[in-house]
Amino acid sequence: MIERGKFRSLTLINWNGFFARTFDLDELVTTLSGGNGAGKSTTMAAFVTALIPDLTLLHFRNTTEAGATSGSRDKGLHGKLKAGVCYSMLDTINSRHQRVVVGVRLQQVAGRDRKVDIKPFAIQGLPMSVQPTQLVTETLNERQARVLPLNELKDKLEAMEGVQFKQFNSITDYHSLMFDLGIIARRLRSASDRSKFYRLIEASLYGGISSAITRSLRDYLLPENSGVRKAFQDMEAALRENRMTLEAIRVTQSDRDLFKHLISEATNYVAADYMRHANERRVHLDKALEFRRELHTSRQQLAAEQYKHVDMARELAEHNGAEGDLEADYQAASDHLNLVQTALRQQEKIERYEADLDELQIRLEEQNEVVAEAIERQEENEARAEAAELEVDELKSQLADYQQALDVQQTRAIQYNQAIAALNRAKELCHLPDLTADSAAEWLETFQAKELEATEKMLSLEQKMSMAQTAHSQFEQAYQLVVAINGPLARNEAWDVARELLREGVDQRHLAEQVQPLRMRLSELEQRLREQQEAERLLADFCKRQGKNFDIDELEALHQELEARIASLSDSVSNAREERMALRQEQEQLQSRIQSLMQRAPVWLAAQNSLNQLSEQCGEEFTSSQDVTEYLQQLLEREREAIVERDEVGARKNAVDEEIERLSQPGGSEDQRLNALAERFGGVLLSEIYDDVSLEDAPYFSALYGPSRHAIVVPDLSQVTEHLEGLTDCPEDLYLIEGDPQSFDDSVFSVDELEKAVVVKIADRQWRYSRFPEVPLFGRAARESRIESLHAEREVLSERFATLSFDVQKTQRLHQAFSRFIGSHLAVAFESDPEAEIRQLNSRRVELERALSNHENDNQQQRIQFEQAKEGVTALNRILPRLNLLADDSLADRVDEIRERLDEAQEAARFVQQFGNQLAKLEPIVSVLQSDPEQFEQLKEDYAYSQQMQRDARQQAFALTEVVQRRAHFSYSDSAEMLSGNSDLNEKLRERLEQAEAERTRAREALRGHAAQLSQYNQVLASLKSSYDTKKELLNDLQRELQDIGVRADSGAEERARIRRDELHAQLSNNRSRRNQLEKALTFCEAEMDNLTRKLRKLERDYFEMREQVVTAKAGWCAVMRMVKDNGVERRLHRRELAYLSADDLRSMSDKALGALRLAVADNEHLRDVLRMSEDPKRPERKIQFFVAVYQHLRERIRQDIIRTDDPVEAIEQMEIELSRLTEELTSREQKLAISSRSVANIIRKTIQREQNRIRMLNQGLQNVSFGQVNSVRLNVNVRETHAMLLDVLSEQHEQHQDLFNSNRLTFSEALAKLYQRLNPQIDMGQRTPQTIGEELLDYRNYLEMEVEVNRGSDGWLRAESGALSTGEAIGTGMSILVMVVQSWEDESRRLRGKDISPCRLLFLDEAARLDARSIATLFELCERLQMQLIIAAPENISPEKGTTYKLVRKVFQNTEHVHVVGLRGFAPQLPETLPGTDEAPSQAS
């Protein structure tokens, strides 16, 4: 790391109070402590004087008059010195460890002005052991010493080996050495720089915030960018000279420029208007045709909308009519649903009562069963009693009739007897006395038939009897059931009525079972009926939409026809879509192709124009790009040859000019350095001595001296030797000849003259042979002769160079034209004519548009037919599945029939529901009604008679059967005597008879007991019947109410009613939705019709206006075309590339040209009047008259002797060839010299940014600096608003102010000043000239505003002003500012001095007692951080803990005052962490 230079000591010699005193300076802080008048300010004044020995600046205010602004005459310095020689010297050591002593010799000048003479000097190479006081003093004895004057000091130092002493005649040189050696931070080139440095030191010395520094911080902190200013000045000077030359050329070209300007602007003015009118005429025709097409299309759209409006209005009326019916149906459905719900609630009540009745019925049946069981037991008891009676009777009969069979013989006898008995019994029983065994078989069949009949009758009566016996108690119950079902009737009718009721019950039950199927069937038929009605509605709607009535049989065929039509239309639509896509694609391709051709057409036309011009210029016809490139190669070869020849001529011309310039030098010196060397050596050039030699002798003397003819003749070569040492600025070979210039001759050489040559014997062993030069240059006469011949040659060369330059320029212009043509137009120049292709494509586009329009119309009709067919098919798809319904004419009748059957079934169901239980109970006991208990005795008698009859018939049949069976027994007559009775059997029968009689007695007693219990059961049964009848009556009332409601309340009735209501609601909602849609569509259609009507009216108006305009403009356009053709200017005016520009662009082009023409013809009365007349937009032919007038005017002014053409354009091109070369050369030179405004802005802005960054880095070093309430110090750098706006305009909006920077009358500085005034008109520039203002604006420092801010207490950041700070705070803040300035100077100067030098850094502070201890500590810390030396002068309040402290006490001894000095090194303990760069020495006394 480079060490920073340091001030080692300050030496005061013969100052007031200090005879010879050296103050060793601390590396950081040196404190001068002492009371008032102790010499602290004198010490600092000596330091400042040695640092800045400028009497115009030195002004020590604390020793001058109080309140004075100018101070005393000596400005405080004269009184600080003693009489005689005084010195102030600074001993320093720089970063290179070089010891340098700088100082001043001061001496009071006698006189009333109290002046002081100052001489600065410097000493280098002084050994470290030599003290400064030893140099400038001489010890006379132990108590006396003498101060050496400056010349003795110089001699003393020169006597010392390695020591260099330099005395300076100017302060600038003194400061330059100090800067180079790293003693001061900035190079002080001028008095202004010294003033700034002194103001810095002065501000440091007296403390506080220096207004002189704060007001001009820019000058202190920002380096001057003089290189930029110098570059601008050189640029402006060169530009000024160049512009003067260009102005001269422009004056020469005035006629040509005027002609060219007039022709170009007149052509632009008239051609733009001509082509605009042509374009407008075409546009108006296209618009008229377009208006007509749109008018036709709008009329068709309006008619279509009107038809659509009528259809939608009709449909809306239909929906409005249907909405009322649907609302009524919906209300009826809602009412029906409410009735169904009421009926269902009634039905629920009925079901509850029926449940109660069922429960009572069950209890009644149970009680009936109990009664029946009791009756059965009663009947059993009766049967048992009767059986006992019968058994008794039978036993009695058996006892009477029974015979006992014996053994086999007895059995035969018995059988015989039995057969006889059987025959007798048969005769008796059958009442057939004539009956025999043989005839018994025939009578058997007869009596068997009787038996069968009697058995059947008996069985019937037995059944009746049995039933009567078992159901005697149920007859009343059955009778009551029949009465309940049928009503009152006679008891004898009960059986027949019951059977009829049972048969009717079966039928009713069968019908009741059909209720659900009938209901489902009815629902199905009703659904089909609704579908039939919907189908009829759809069919009616379909017929209405088709506009024709169709039979049902025709619908399928129509459906197939529509399907076929849809298929064909779909194919047609699909094909039409593809065809339309193909047409549109072709149209888009055509449009794209036309657009690309229209974009290419201007390029192609420009290429054709360029190609025609090239053909006219070179006289060649080009048919392909190969021809152009081949001709360009030939042109390049010609150009190369011409350039080579021109360069050779130019090089020869330059060589001639250089030779003329060299020969024109005074004294014949070809090298200016020889003149300087001759003056330095005190000699004379040899060519000056022989300047008067004649032209004839010139070849001889030139050959005689040979290479030494440019030698210098000096009186004494020995005196030149010391000058030759270290000589570098001289020719490679420098000849010196000793001799007297006043009497010099050629005797110095031994010469032998030969034929046109000489032999010079330079030495015994060295000769030189030189021939006479063909063109001698030795002597003024020879040089003048040579110059004359060179001038003649130069004239020839100049003329040849001009001719060649003209040819090269012409060739280059032609080459440039070819190059431009190749670069810009070659690719398209030989392509086909885009305009012809555009015309073909436009005709094809028109055909496509017409075909597309026809196709759209056809496609629209097909689409309408397709939609209609689709709607028809959709409707038929809904109708065809219902054709069978439509064809079913009996559906309504079947519905009525099923409804009637359902009513019957429901009646039967209600009958079954009402009487089903009674019938079910009646059916098992209906038989009891066959016999009335009141006829039971008769029935018994009938049964007994029938039984007897059956028994008799059986006996008769049995008897006959027995006879028939015993027919063989009649032969056993012999065994009859053997039959006998059996007395034992009779005894057993009697015993059984007694037992049977006892059993009969017991059965009769049981019968009487059970009869009483049966009576109790009958009473319970009667109560249950009463409750049942009451419930039954209530149930009948509810059923009658349900019948009065008139609604079938089955399980699905509510769901069907709700579905019906929801269907009607959905239909009503759909109808309303469709009605709303139709109303909206109708409103939109009406609005669309209104819009179309308004559009139609506007189109009609626009069409008729456009048509009238086209017709009106046609007459004027015909007059214009006739005038153009008559005057032959169509080629100039009909610029086809302008046909592709818009009307606004052409009008703008014409207006711009008109403005330029007004200025161009302002001095020509005739053209001015014609131009004014041509401005009438209603008379376009007058513009043609103006163009013809301009051409005529230019033809009259063409010099036919120079330019042999009748065309002004060709004349201008020929005039331009010669002058353009000079203009291009000077313009290119100007462009090389000129600098753009954007570059200036960038340079200034970059410089500002660099300096702002530098200031920001400086601010970082002061962030932790605090004094009193001041917590931090910073420097704000802002760009002035007015200057920032200037930079923005220069960089971004410079095109708007090119009138200033492109002006030939203004330099760049003046243009910059004018721009500043234009941007800031409110600023008063005073008496300063624009050049001065512009030069100030080129200095970036004038763009910046700088101010110092402090962070003080609770106030935050505020501007640093002395009035806002305490004294100590102002001192600390001012010191911070000064440190920042010093750092800035070092950064600025780093690039100017050596990289290995870091300059000394030292500041002062007088009267430091105004700072508190904390601020003093802050200063110490600042010095440590910045490696800065600080000299503080203060009273006794400074504690010598750090740095070096000198105690100064002024004493008087024997009328002589001197200052007693005691120095102390800091004795404070070293901190644990020291700041970088600090190195405190141990405490010691000095």
UniProtKB/Swiss-Prot annotation:
Which positions in this protein are listed as binding ATP? 34-41
GO CC, one annotated term = nucleoid
Where on the tree of life does the source sit, at the highest rank?
A: Bacteria
GO MF, one term, reads: DNA binding
- State the residue spans of region: Flexible hinge: 666-783
Enumerate the SUPFAM superfamilies for this protein.
P-loop containing nucleoside triphosphate hydrolases (SSF52540)
GO terms classed as biological process: cell division; chromosome condensation; chromosome segregation; DNA replication
Q: Which InterPro entries match?
A: MukB (IPR012090), MukB/SMC (IPR050308), MukB_hinge (IPR032520), MukB_hinge_sf (IPR042501), MukB_N_dom (IPR007406), P-loop_NTPase (IPR027417)
Q: Would the keyword Secreted be found if you checked this record's keyword annotation?
A: no
Q: Which residues form a coiled coil?
A: 326-418, 444-480, 509-603, 835-923, 977-1115, 1209-1266
Which keywords annotate this record?
ATP-binding, Cell cycle, Cell division, Chromosome partition, Coiled coil, Cytoplasm, DNA condensation, DNA-binding, Nucleotide-binding
* Keyword Cell division in record: yes
User: What task does this protein carry out?
Assistant: Plays a central role in chromosome condensation, segregation and cell cycle progression. Functions as a homodimer, which is essential for chromosome partition. Involved in negative DNA supercoiling in vivo, and by this means organize and compact chromosomes. May achieve or facilitate chromosome segregation by condensation DNA from both sides of a centrally located replisome during cell division.
Q: Quaternary arrangement and interactors, per the entry?
A: Homodimerization via its hinge domain. Binds to DNA via its C-terminal region. Interacts, and probably forms a ternary complex, with MukE and MukF via its C-terminal region. The complex formation is stimulated by calcium or magnesium. Interacts with tubulin-related protein FtsZ.
* HAMAP family assigned to the protein according to its UniProt record, in alphabetical order: MukB
Family annotation (NCBIfam families): PRK04863.1
The family line of this record is:
Belongs to the SMC family. MukB subfamily.
Q: What's noted about domains in the record? A: The hinge domain, which separates the large intramolecular coiled coil regions, allows the homodimerization, forming a V-shaped homodimer.
Q: What's the protein here called?
A: Chromosome partition protein MukB
